[in-house]
From Swiss-Prot:
Keywords assigned by UniProt, alphabetized: Aminoacyl-tRNA synthetase, ATP-binding, Cytoplasm, Ligase, Nucleotide-binding, Protein biosynthesis, RNA-binding
Location(s), subcellular: Cytoplasm
Gene3D superfamilies per record: HUPs, RNA-binding S4 domain, Tyrosyl-Transfer RNA Synthetase
Quaternary context: Homodimer.
Annotated organism of origin: Neisseria meningitidis serogroup B (strain ATCC BAA-335 / MC58)
Domain of life: Bacteria
Binding-site list for ATP: 234
Family matches, as InterPro entries: aa-tRNA-synth_I_CS, aa-tRNA-synth_Ic, Rossmann-like_a/b/a_fold, S4_RNA-bd_sf, SYY-like_C, Tyr-tRNA-ligase, Tyr-tRNA-ligase_bac-type, Tyr-tRNA-ligase_bac_1
Motif 'HIGH' region positions after renumbering to this chain: 39-48
Protein name: Tyrosine--tRNA ligase
């Protein structure tokens, strides 16, 4: 199966230029292709995964991937299908983000061997280009009429009170020139990107043809949508980042575990490197079993292993199991740090707090009366163990102090997992 056929079978091609010619070229020879990543934050998020993984798929098929980090274009920001003008970031901020993203892209690709990946930065050519050269050598090849007719531009112009600045309007010229420059430097003949990049990609194809008289191609990947219509890649806490310091491996694992049945088999095709035959077999087995599908667990394991590695996957599984177990002794200090980052609602507490106060403080009970009821019915656990009276000498006027949280409840001298019922947790972080 060719790489194009594999992408098609996974539903990963939204648009492409001359797919027959592209498929024939890929079968005849090994090519160089690229995808650009503008630094809009200090980390990539799961919305970047499809193009990143597509580069990897092409490399596995023997082609040379080029990961282009937009050190120059990131200073402007892509206006494509954005409702309003982007805020401009300082050169120092963008430079820091460029380095972070370069480091994140590196593990996905192999930089050794005959088709070693290439890391590029468009600041290398735009940084030395002056305004006159840009307007004379690049600008003359772009029709303003054609640029105004691009859907992404028309939407901004037609939106009341929006409009578009010349800075953002000129963005497609910069991205278009990236293709021409990478064609000249590295022989790149294919640009891939998200479906919102079609206009920018075709601009680059046209410019490369005009400047170098070369036939080049473009391919876009689909916009990832969920069956319920909500945006993919967002949680109540915001974006799901690929940086473990921004989204913990545990939370990342949980994100994939919670994928809806209606989406999970599509996402296995989109995001994993399991074969179509393996995915079809998983789906058939799930449907035949009549019980809880295995697909979400497989998806969560594949993605966490791919992004964070085996150790992080083991930690995510250990945390997931321990939260509902009586014995939580297997949790490491690093596991608790993940929970404190984003795994559980975390609350700072001080010595002297009793379990009733802790339940109310964390929102696991709405009042002291309700909290006492939970404690009396044995529905409250501290680190997996039932909360029990441990302070027989408490003051008569403070009956709730019968169960004080103290040193025996502190894991690593800092953490306590408070649980009410089967699925309601909070993390107490001791000052």
């Amino acid at each position: 199966m060719s790489v194009i056929q594999d992408l098609q079978s996974r539903g990963l091609i939204a648009q492409t230029t001359d797919i027959e010619a592209l498929d024939a070229l890929l079968n005849e020879q090994k090519i160089a292709l690229y995808c650009g990543f503008d630094p809009t934050a200090d980390s990539l998020h799961i919305g970047h995964l499809l193009p990143v993984l597509a580069l990897r798929r092409f490399q596995q098929a023997g082609h040379t991937p080029i990961a282009l980090v937009g050190g120059a274009t990131g200073m402007i920001g892509d206006p494509s299908f954005k409702a309003a003008e982007r805020s401009l970031n300082s050169a120092e901020t963008v430079a820091g983000w460029v380095e972070s993203i370069r480091n994140q892209l590196t593990p996905f690709l192999s930089f050794e061997g005959g088709n070693a990946a290439i890391m590029a930065n468009n600041a290398d050519w735009f940084g030395s280009m002056n305004c006159l050269d840009f307007l004379r050598d690049i600008g003359k090849h772009f029709s303003v009429n054609a640029m105004l007719n691009k859907e992404s531009v028309k939407q901004r112009i037609d939106r009341d009170g929006a409009g578009i600045s010349f800075t953002e309007f000129a963005y497609s010229l910069l991205q278009g020139y990236d293709f021409a420059e990478l064609n000249k430097r590295h022989g790149a003949v294919l640009e891939i990107g998200g479906s919102d990049q079609w206009g920018n990609i075709t601009a680059g194809i046209d410019l490369t043809r005009r400047l170098h008289q070369k036939q080049v191609f473009g391919l876009t990947l689909p916009l990832v949508t969920k069956s319920d219509g909500t945006k993919f890649g967002k949680t109540e806490g915001g974006a799901v980042w690929l940086n473990a310091k921004k989204t913990s491996p545990y939370q990342f694992y949980q994100f994939w575990l919670k994928v809806a049945d209606a989406d999970v088999y599509k996402f296995l095709k989109y995001f994993t490197f399991l074969s179509i035959e393996e995915i079809d077999a998983i789906e058939a087995k799930d449907k035949a079993s009549g019980s809880k599908p295995e697909a979400q667990r497989i998806l969560a394991e594949e993605m966490t292993r791919l992004i964070h590695g085996e150790e992080a996957l083991a930690a995510a599984q250990r945390i997931s199991e321990s939260l509902f177990a009586e014995d939580q002794s297997s949790l490491t200090e690093s596991d608790f740090e993940q929970l404190a980052l984003d795994g559980l609602p975390a609350f700072e507490v001080s010595d002297g707090i009793n379990v009733v106060e802790a339940l109310v403080k964390t929102g696991l009970a709405s009042s002291n009366k309700e909290a006492r009821g939970f404690v009396n019915s044995k529905a409250v656990l501290l680190n997996g163990k039932p909360a029990e009276a441990n302070n027989p000498n408490h003051a008569a006027e403070r009956p709730d102090d019968a169960c004080l949280l103290n040193g025996e409840h502190k894991r690593f001298g800092k953490y306590t997992i408070l649980r009410r019922g089967k699925r309601n947790h909070a993390l107490l972080v001791w000052k």
